[in-house]
């Protein structure tokens, strides 16, 4: 793959359509209005010296965006480099005067960007995170040129850190176990990696918000969230990214998640409602109090929902707690306080629909798991800001929270096993979350329903509906359209019904066209 073929510039715009002059930025004769379309994919470009937490931010941000339903993927340049150079020798590979290595590193960047393009155009990706140092203006300009040619938005995230303790801790926690350093002792790894950082410092050009980079969209994160500098945020997604990055921290803490004690409705097999604790539920609450006292957790906060069963569980702890309405259990609408057998008898169609696509299914007059994720987003933001915390919630709520911390997709989320009287201890680590389950030896009923094993033919899959408004969410016969209009061309006109039918039935349609996802 050559550089010229990767970043070719279109020679002319569509001759049959001449748009009026506008004040939009243009690159040569290329019409660039498409890069400002609201639904254009966004390329997040990380910037910073090694050991500044770029990969930590990349993975965490990707996990959050996927959780809220925005298809996102990380492209780590280190992975591409290790594919190209199988054996890492020393920091000499990163010297700016090592011409052969510089060519390899640039070629790896080009290959990664081509994969970004394929992800956007062929896999319906919405956001790609380009995880690399990108410390020179030359490299960043190359990325900007690539994005303009393909009508992608660009948002830079620069991580700046001058705290030697933070840098050293990052090297020891993450880099010692890096594939670059197999079977090496810590002292040698630290020495080599510090020299690698010095190689990057020679050519490092930070973002310049006052002059050279004043027109770019970016956020500078200084000393792991001590200060922030935000410049020219373009859209809703970028504002959400900024808000998220301003809430996360890296201080050690533990998050405890558990459901309320067994309730009277749990014993009857009923869903929803606002029943109190059973005898065994009260036993669990006392066992939970004893467990927390033994742990001697400093400055522990306790959150509950506003439903009776979580409040009664927290009351037994003898500590201050906060009630959150948004932690209430999923709203089952007309099915509240019914057993699954009763739902199947009274609403057989609804029962079958929920089994087909549990994440998207919305109870009539109630909520779906997708709705619940949106409702819980403020909880995630606050959890990211907190220290040690215990959240006493409900089965569906706990599934959503666990899916965020464990990076589980929409298919897995509604079927995560969250038993009664089990505590999940989550400890954030470098690139993920360590999970421990703690049993307090108090019996309880099993409220888990496994995923149905039967498969429905696509021809039998109904149109998904908003159950309380009967507004279609999507059609099983989606008309496929190009992800983005080609640069310089007239936006496609709406299809007539006959033409739409032709497109659905025709066998000669382009294979690379994809439907436009709604975010």
From Swiss-Prot:
SMART domains in alphabetical order: PGAM
Biological processes per GO annotation: fructose 2,6-bisphosphate metabolic process; fructose metabolic process; glycolytic process
EC number: 2.7.1.105, 3.1.3.46
Catalytic activity reported: beta-D-fructose 2,6-bisphosphate + H2O = beta-D-fructose 6-phosphate + phosphate; beta-D-fructose 6-phosphate + ATP = beta-D-fructose 2,6-bisphosphate + ADP + H(+)
Binding site for ATP: 48-56, 170-175, 351-354, 395-399, 431
GO molecular function annotations of the record: 6-phosphofructo-2-kinase activity; ATP binding; fructose-2,6-bisphosphate 2-phosphatase activity
PANTHER family attached to this UniProt entry: 6-PHOSPHOFRUCTO-2-KINASE/FRUCTOSE-2,6-BISPHOSPHATASE, 6-PHOSPHOFRUCTO-2-KINASE_FRUCTOSE-2,6-BISPHOSPHATASE 2
Function: Synthesis and degradation of fructose 2,6-bisphosphate.
Name listed for the protein in its UniProt record: 6-phosphofructo-2-kinase/fructose-2,6-bisphosphatase 2
Organism of provenance: Mus musculus
Organism classification: Eukaryota, Metazoa, Chordata, Craniata, Vertebrata
Name of the gene: Pfkfb2
């Amino acid at each position: 793959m050559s550089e010229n073929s990767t970043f070719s510039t279109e020679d002319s715009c569509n001759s049959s359509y001449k748009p009026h002059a506008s004040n939009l930025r243009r690159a040569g004769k290329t019409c660039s209005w498409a890069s400002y379309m609201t639904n254009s994919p966004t390329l997040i470009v990380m910037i910073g010296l090694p050991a500044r937490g770029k990969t930590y931010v990349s993975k965490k941000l990707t996990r959050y965006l996927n959780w809220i339903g925005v298809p996102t993927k990380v492209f780590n340049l280190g992975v591409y480099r290790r594919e190209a150079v199988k054996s890492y020798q020393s920091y000499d590979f990163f010297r700016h005067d090592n011409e052969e290595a510089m060519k390899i590193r640039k070629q790896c960047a080009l290959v990664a960007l081509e994969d970004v393009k394929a992800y956007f155009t062929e896999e319906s990706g919405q956001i790609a995170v380009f995880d690399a140092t990108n410390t020179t203006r030359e490299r960043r300009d190359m990325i900007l040129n690539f994005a303009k040619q393909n009508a992608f938005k660009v948002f830079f995230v620069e991580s700046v850190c001058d705290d030697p303790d933070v840098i050293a801790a990052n090297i020891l926690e993450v880099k010692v176990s890096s594939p670059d350093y197999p079977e090496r002792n810590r002292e040698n790894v630290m020495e080599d990696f510090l020299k690698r950082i010095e190689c990057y410092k020679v050519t490092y050009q930070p973002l310049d918000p006052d002059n050279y980079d004043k027109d770019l969209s970016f956020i500078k994160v200084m000393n792991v969230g001590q200060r922030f500098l935000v410049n020219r945020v373009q859209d809703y997604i970028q504002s959400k990214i900024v808000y998220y990055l301003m809430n996360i921290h890296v201080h050690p803490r533990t998050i405890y998640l558990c459901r309320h004690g067994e309730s009277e409705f749990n014993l009857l097999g009923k869903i929803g409602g606002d029943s109190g604790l059973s005898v065994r539920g009260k036993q669990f609450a006392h066992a939970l109090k004893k467990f927390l006292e033994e742990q001697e957790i400093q400055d522990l906060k306790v959150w509950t929902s506003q439903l009776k069963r979580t409040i009664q569980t927290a009351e037994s702890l003898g500590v201050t707690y906060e009630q959150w309405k948004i932690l209430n259990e999923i709203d089952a609408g007309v099915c509240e306080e019914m057993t699954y057998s009763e739902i199947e008898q009274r609403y057989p169609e609804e029962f079958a629909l929920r089994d087909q696509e549990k994440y998207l299914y919305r109870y009539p007059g109630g909520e779906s798991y997708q709705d619940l994720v949106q409702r819980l987003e403020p909880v995630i933001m606050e959890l990211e800001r907190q220290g040690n915390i215990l959240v006493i919630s409900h089965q569906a709520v706990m599934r959503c929270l666990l899916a965020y911390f464990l990076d589980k997709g929409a298919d897995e989320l509604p079927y995560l096993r969250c038993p009664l009287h089990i505590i999940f201890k989550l400890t954030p680590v470098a690139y993920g979350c360590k999970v421990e389950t703690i049993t307090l030896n108090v019996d309880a009923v099993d409220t888990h329903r496994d995923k149905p094993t039967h498969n429905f033919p696509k021809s039998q899959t109904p149109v998904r509906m908003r159950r309380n408004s009967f507004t279609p969410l999507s059609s099983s016969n989606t008309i496929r359209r190009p992800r983005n209009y080609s640069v310089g061309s007239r936006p496609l006109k709406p299809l007539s019904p006959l033409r739409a039918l032709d497109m659905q039935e025709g066998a000669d349609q382009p294979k690379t066209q994809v439907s436009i996802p709604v975010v």
